Amino acid sequence: MASYLFRVKADWDPRNLWRDIVIGGARSLEDLHRAINTSFEIGFDHLWFFGTNRDFWRSRKMYKSPKDFENLPKWMEYWDRLSGRSEAETNAAGVSIDELNLKVGDRLCYLFDYADEWRFYLILKKILEDEPSQKEPVIVKGKGEIFG
């Protein structure tokens, strides 16, 4: 397999606030979430999701924080069944980067904290065929600080 180079941009200031992150394809979306939050120094104490569309809340597929699945109310379980979503499809901890079948130029959205809505989007810049698929996430370049 391979590793992937993503440019992660803050939606509110994409030219001045971004990070380049390399991550192995066998790594989970939860691993990517941790790399993003570490690189922007925003913590880990809120719910989050990755989406496949540019419109965050209207994404056809949402890969959510594992905490989204803890102690779900019954109506949420019912909604997931009706919508055709199963935990395996939507729990980000169980989805690898490889499983997304991304091509160079494809985009993902990432939303952290459902109340404050820290919005980021990711662009796949390069597929690194010679890098191992188990590669730990690495921040290779960046610009700007959120709290600076």
Predicted regions and their residues:
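Short linear regulatory motifs enriched in tryptophan with gly/pro/ser
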Residues: 1-148
